């Protein structure tokens, strides 16, 4: 589990309908719950459900940030907002919290609050585009599950998010943008890690747009190398995993 996450969980009891954990932390919580290994991650990625958000949550979150003593408080600009808080005063708090809101005014700031501009890197830009997409945002709202009292995006819904991030970052790099290859590889590997939780009977309905993205991902991944052994995945191969993903999302008859 991410260092310091226990205190976070305790602080936000009662607000479970107002946010969902995505990204590496969601994967970590889900995999740990199934007693499977996952890569190390130090940041907590949170998406706010703007239809449910309350002023109380915003105030509680700001109090938590102050209590944790985060040294660096950053905020992006634009219609949607990214907030990043890093370097807390102790390991009782997550090293980094990244929070995304389609509503820029969810946090009630005090007069002396200082938020410095947040540089928009490839990861933030990609995630922002995905979460501002209505189809993916709807999947996020309907695809949640509870793991040890924490709302997280379920494995079958996390996989399309990871696949879309891989497609997006890969396309940007091919177009000449500066994109860290490690981030591209990370999303690809996470799809295969999460696929361990899918069985022959697992099914997930996707919107037409997301289904097309998943088909594109599975088609393009066919030419990619995936080192399953290094991911701790045994007893299967890449072809079997991709076939199971086609079946899970009902894509097989259309490929």
Show where each model-derived region lies.
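Compositionally biased terminal segments of proteins
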Residues: 1-255
């Amino acid at each position: 589990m991410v260092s310091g996450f226990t205190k976070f969980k305790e602080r936000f009891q009662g607000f479970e309908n107002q946010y969902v954990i995505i990204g590496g932390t969601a994967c970590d919580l889900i995999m740990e719950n199934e007693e499977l290994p996952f890569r190390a991650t130090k940041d907590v990625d949170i998406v706010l459900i703007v239809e449910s958000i309350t002023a109380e949550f915003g105030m509680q979150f700001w109090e938590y940030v102050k209590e944790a003593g985060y040294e660096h408080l950053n905020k992006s600009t634009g219609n949607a907002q990214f907030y990043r808080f890093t370097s807390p005063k102790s390991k009782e708090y997550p090293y980094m919290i990244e929070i995304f809101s389609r509503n820029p005014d969810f946090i009630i700031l005090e007069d002396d609050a200082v938020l410095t501009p947040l540089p928009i890197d490839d990861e933030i830009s990609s995630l922002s585009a995905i979460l501002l997409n209505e189809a993916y945002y709807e999947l996020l709202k309907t695809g949640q599950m509870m793991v040890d009292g924490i709302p997280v995006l379920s494995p079958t819904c996390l996989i399309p998010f990871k696949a879309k991030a891989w497609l997006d970052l890969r396309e940007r790099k091919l177009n000449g943008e500066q994109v860290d290859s490690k981030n591209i590889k990370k999303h690809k590997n996470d799809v295969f890690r999460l696929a361990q939780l899918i069985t022959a009977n697992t099914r997930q309905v996707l919107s037409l747009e997301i289904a097309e993205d998943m088909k594109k991902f599975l088609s393009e991944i066919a030419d990619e190398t995936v080192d399953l052994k290094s991911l701790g995945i045994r007893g299967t191969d890449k072809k079997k995993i991709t076939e199971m993903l086609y079946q899970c999302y009902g894509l097989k008859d259309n490929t």
